[in-house]
UniProtKB/Swiss-Prot annotation:
Disulfide bond positions: none
Signal peptide range in chain numbering: 1-20
SMART domains the UniProt entry points to: EMP24_GP25L
Organism whose genome encodes this protein: Drosophila virilis (Fruit fly)
Family: Belongs to the EMP24/GP25L family.
Protein name: Transmembrane emp24 domain-containing protein eca
Keywords: Coiled coil, Developmental protein, Endoplasmic reticulum, Membrane, Signal, Transmembrane, Transmembrane helix
One BP annotation, GO: dorsal/ventral pattern formation
Transmembrane segments: 184-203
Start and end residues of each GOLD domain: 30-126
Membrane topology summary: Single-pass type I membrane protein
UniProt function note: Eca and bai are essential, though not redundant, for dorsoventral patterning of the embryo. Specifically required during early embryogenesis for the activity of maternal tkv, while the zygotic tkv is not affected. Involved in Golgi organization.
Residues exposed to the Lumenal side: 21-183
Location(s) in or outside the cell: Endoplasmic reticulum membrane
């Protein structure tokens, strides 16, 4: 029983992601990230843009004139979010189809600063990691125990979504494998038919050649 509890705790602790990173781009460069998201799952993106200062050889908070255009596409390549934000912001969206969601970011400027380099700090939170439980507790006036139960229920719900998504991926992979195997089979049969026809044609051609030479 204790081992089962430990395993469940590990699953809950490692459950879907909150990733923090930073990257460098020029003002006209586009950067995209792929995040696998189950359906009906909230995703929150926090970012901050810093502008390179050659005088101090470091990065400073960017000019108010620089913003970030954020575009999000779902697994069907449908745009579900496209908007220009300021140099520091927070956005959220909810997935309606499971699969890979592409999050693209690029500066809204047109090289006003001669293509200056930008540093973008990015933090993507998915699932129950995207919920601000302190705010939830304050709004709904939950006790510490009620809040903990709420967190556990949300985690269980997220685990269910993850399991459903894994089943969806397995089904899609199986369908792709079956389709590939079917194509390979038909291609092999087509090659066999072509080889048989070529062999038959060559035999008839040789027979006609030998008959013309009166060798048979």
């Amino acid at each position: 029983m204790r081992n089962q509890f430990i395993c469940l705790a590990l699953v809950l602790c490692t459950l879907h992601s909150a990733c923090g990173l930073y990257f460098h781009i020029s003002e006209t460069e586009r950067k995209c990230f792929i995040e696998e998201v189950p359906d009906e799952t909230t995703v929150i993106v926090n970012y901050k843009v810093e502008l390179y200062d050659p005088r101090s050889n470091g990065f400073m908070p960017s000019s108010p004139g620089i913003g970030m255009h954020v575009e999000v596409r779902d697994s069907d390549d449908k745009v579900i979010l496209s908007r220009v934000y300021s140099s520091q912001g927070r956005m959220s969206f909810t997935s309606h189809t499971p699969g890979e969601h592409v999050i693209c970011m690029y500066s809204n400027s047109t090289a006003w600063f001669n293509g200056a380099q930008l540093r973008v700090h990015l933090d993507i939170q998915v699932g129950e990691h995207a919920i601000d439980y302190a705010n939830v507790a304050q709004k709904e006036k939950l006790t510490e125990l009620q809040l903990r139960i709420r967190q556990l229920l949300d985690q269980v719900e997220q685990i269910t979504k993850e399991q459903n998504y894994q089943r969806y991926r397995e089904e899609r992979f199986r369908h792709t494998s079956e389709s590939t195997n079917s194509r390979v089979l038909w291609w092999s049969l087509a090659q066999t038919v072509v080889l048989v026809c070529m062999g038959f044609w060559q035999m008839r051609h040789l027979k006609s050649f030998f008959e013309a030479k009166k060798l048979v």
